[in-house]
Amino acid sequence: MGLEEKLPGGVLLASVEKLANWSRRSSLWPATFGLACCAIEMMSTGAGRYDLSRFGMEVFRASPRQADLMIVAGRVSQKMAPVLRQIYDQMPEPKWVLSMGVCASSGGMFNNYAIVQGVDHIVPVDMYLPGCPPRPEMLMDAIIKLHEKILAGPISGRIEHTKIGSSPYPKPIEVATARAGLPEGAFDTRTLSVNDRKRFSIPAGAPAPTGGGAVEPALDTRRPAALAPPSVFGRAKRIPVDPKPSDEARAHGPGPTTESIGDVDGPDRGI
């Protein structure tokens, strides 16, 4: 009827949350962080043929303090896990993680002691991208889906305050260590392979032994040092053993007073 008020041209109504998330989505700067073969496909995605600058991502920052997206491109070795976590901690919040390739997501073909069986044991992951390796088109599709997730998320983003080894996944080795009466920290849970986790696992709901109870059969109290994995930094370490073993350990035979564990590259170097 001509009585309605009309907004003048050039005025846009939006919430502060939508505006902040739109800005984050449109200027998502990845960190320069390549680990293995998937990094080649990530570099191809940033080249002129696919041109990530269309999505505001042409700048791969060399400093984690200027990046807000970590693309874990390739398998993560046990020695690289602390470095990866340190880079993640240096990134400003809010920040996001994209696990590129099956090796980064679940270990892939590297089902052994040297490779982390899933990067989500080290850092929280927002988007998983399968493939070996995934093509640049697949990486772009995963990035677009991550953009949609950022746009629909809260203004505070996903803020995490965790440390290495504080993954939400259960750590049965810690439970088994406590039940075996070994000192806290005798096992480094960061260096356990998937086979070791299965070896030391305890059935859910199993009652904890009381004083004088039997030790879990999955652990051998005669040689606790032999069960300890090597250091994550590759150095040999020594774990002292009580020279006066318990009655249960004595029934299995005498054990050594000190054992040496070699590094992952070879025999004990006496470090």
UniProtKB/Swiss-Prot annotation:
[4Fe-4S] cluster binds at residues 37-38, 103, 132. The keyword Transmembrane helix does not apply. Residues 239-251 have a biased composition (Basic and acidic residues). GO terms for molecular function: 4 iron, 4 sulfur cluster binding; iron ion binding; NADH dehydrogenase (ubiquinone) activity; NADH:ubiquinone reductase (non-electrogenic) activity; quinone binding. Keywords: 4Fe-4S, Cell membrane, Iron, Iron-sulfur, Membrane, Metal-binding, NAD, Quinone, Translocase, Transport. Its cofactor is [4Fe-4S] cluster. GO terms for cellular component: plasma membrane; respiratory chain complex I. It catalyses: a quinone + NADH + 5 H(+)(in) = a quinol + NAD(+) + 4 H(+)(out). GO terms for biological process: aerobic respiration; electron transport coupled proton transport. Its main location: membrane. It is a peripheral membrane protein. The keyword Ribonucleoprotein does not apply. Pfam families: Oxidored_q6. Residues 227-271 are annotated as: Disordered. It is found in: Cell membrane. Binds 1 [4Fe-4S] cluster. Its EC number is 7.1.1.-. NDH-1 is composed of 14 different subunits. Subunits NuoB, C, D, E, F, and G constitute the peripheral sector of the complex. Belongs to the complex I 20 kDa subunit family. NDH-1 shuttles electrons from NADH, via FMN and iron-sulfur (Fe-S) centers, to quinones in the respiratory chain. The immediate electron acceptor for the enzyme in this species is believed to be a menaquinone. Couples the redox reaction to proton translocation (for every two electrons transferred, four hydrogen ions are translocated across the cytoplasmic membrane), and thus conserves the redox energy in a proton gradient. PANTHER family: NADH DEHYDROGENASE, NADH DEHYDROGENASE [UBIQUINONE] IRON-SULFUR PROTEIN 7, MITOCHONDRIAL. This is NADH-quinone oxidoreductase subunit B.
